[in-house]
Amino acid sequence: CVMRREKKIEIRVCKTKDNRFTVDDFAALADERTRIIVMSTLEWCNGWASDMKAIGDFCQEKGIFLVVDAVQQLGVTKIDTKECHFDLLVAGGHKWLNSPYGTGVLYVNKNSLSKIKQSYAGYLNTTVPEGGWGAYWENPAAPSVHDWTFPETARKYEIGGTSNYTGAIALGESLGLVNEIGIENIQEHIWELSAYCMDQLEAIGATIITHRDPGRRGGIVIARLYDDLDVDRWVLKQLHARKIFIAQRFTDYVGGFRISCQYFNNHADIDAMAA
């Protein structure tokens, strides 16, 4: 690991127990030297949605930074950044927000802004000069070297150079659609559909890895059909040939078939997959 090798940072990995994390698992690894917990709000290889409020409360009590990747949850279920005491939340837009690659969002807690330095400087993340950038570039006396300052907002963490404007427009439209449908409506639909998916998979003999706990899952359902990985790969190819696109995902031997139940999917889609 680069951070471990070059920055001399000790990294402790929290392993799942019965395909889940709890706040106690993280607490058992933390001590007075722990500075930051970095984790996914919803795991990509087993579908587990952690109790982020409990973990956030623990981090706030111990003075530990909490940084989360919400790429598998944003656009699926509600996330309360303040209630969970997130210092940073990041998420790509290309998954459950159905946006182009190279798009995403960053949330930074206001109380954390002064503690996190930006990595680079560019005209899009520095303080806008008087009159705006257009007037600045048109000024013959504009210096080539300037003592730039940064705004005390999350904008100072922008890349600084040319932005992905077309991708941002698409991301904005996608977020607008999510808000139009309502995240509560999406959440209820996906919870019901993912439960139906698990029922149908169990009916054909699959082993379900994802937990059924209410509130502890999103749209990801992980299942295994056979003990032979090559046979499962053959099944995957047959589904793809029928234009039914699921995936196989593993990490540390945890995983299986990954079925993503989106807000635009329905029971007929699940029935076609399980047929």
Residue ranges and their predicted role:
Residues 9, 61-65, 86, 110:
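A short helix->loop->beta-strand "cap" motif at the edges of active sites that frequently abuts
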Residues 11, 66-67, 208, 246:
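Hydrophobic beta-strand scaffold residues
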Residues 18-71, 75, 96:
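Active-site phosphate-binding strand-loop segment of PLP-dependent enzymes
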Residues 28, 227-237, 241-275:
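PLP-dependent enzyme catalytic core of the Aspartate aminotransferase-like
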Residues 84-139:
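Active-site PLP attachment segment
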